[in-house]
């Protein structure tokens, strides 16, 4: 009896799952692991976003200057993204995006973007951003993670490991709590779960680069990214690392890559 046959069969099945689960990202054109349709992720996003806002203090832009600033910067980043996709004859890639920016009163140093353009900024990160330019860096970076479908890839990996790669609807009906937790972790909603998963260095570099492009196109200064990450790192010295750093690891090499990409990002000024 050949004891290796079951192992070979299992290996081939895993390979088939990966091949069938690969799709092309509409922004980069690169293949990625994603067996969850974007429309399903957006549908879940809208539900989770509403639930999150119901359980947190959302600051009104009519009454709070910082909330108004988040809305203002967010609107400019959104217009920049829409121009970029229009100039690339790729506006269809934004189908289902219903942009929404909210500031919540929470000391957590964090910000995130769910599929479909659902963004939350925590007041705890504002002492580190300090200005509109740095806030644009943060928003551009977070929106890029969503447009690049990094969270979808992470959730696909988690579902493959934990529920065998079944359809999202099946996972929600059979293991609703676990599936919702996977979704929240995949998008760095740290206050809703006990831990979050760090983005890979590859994902971070992609989000940094596209985020800088949106920042420039929106009329902000991209060089503020270097000062922002310096302040972020200083804020963690001697203390528990901010939630933002747990999902967005930073180091000297990263800042070097950001600095090296700035000339390329500046080519998008005025576009």
Regions found by a protein language model. Name each.
Residues 1-11:
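Bacterial N-terminal signal peptides that target proteins for export
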Residues 7-9, 22-271:
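A Zn2+-metalloprotease active-site environment signal
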Residues 10-19:
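Bacterial N-terminal signal peptides
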């Amino acid at each position: 009896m050949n004891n290796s046959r079951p192992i070979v069969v299992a290996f081939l099945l895993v390979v088939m799952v990966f091949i069938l689960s690969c799709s092309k990202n509409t922004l980069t054109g690169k293949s990625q692991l994603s067996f969850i349709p974007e429309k399903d992720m957006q549908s879940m996003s809208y539900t989770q976003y509403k639930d999150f806002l119901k359980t947190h203090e959302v600051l009104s832009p009519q009454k709070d200057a910082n909330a108004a600033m988040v809305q203002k910067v967010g609107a400019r980043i959104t217009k920049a993204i829409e121009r970029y996709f229009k100039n690339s004859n790729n506006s269809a890639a934004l189908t289902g995006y219903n942009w929404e920016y909210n500031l919540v009163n929470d000391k957590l140093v964090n910000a995130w973007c769910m599929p479909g353009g659902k963004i939350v900024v925590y007041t705890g990160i504002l002492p580190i951003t300090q200005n509109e330019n740095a806030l644009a860096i943060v928003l551009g970076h977070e929106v890029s993670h969503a447009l690049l479908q990094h969270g979808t890839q992470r959730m696909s990996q988690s579902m493959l490991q934990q529920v065998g790669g079944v359809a999202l609807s099946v996972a929600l009906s059979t293991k609703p709590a676990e599936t919702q937790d996977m979704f929240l972790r995949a998008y760095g909603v740290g206050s809703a779960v006990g831990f979050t998963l760090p983005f890979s260095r590859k994902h971070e570099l992609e989000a940094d680069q596209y985020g800088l492009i949106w920042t420039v196109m929106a009329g902000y200064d991209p060089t503020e990214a270097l000062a922002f990450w310096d302040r972020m790192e200083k804020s963690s010295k001697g203390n528990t690392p901010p939630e933002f750093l747990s999902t967005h690891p930073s180091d000297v090499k990263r800042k070097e890559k950001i600095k090296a990409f700035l000339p390329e990002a500046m080519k998008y000024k005025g576009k």
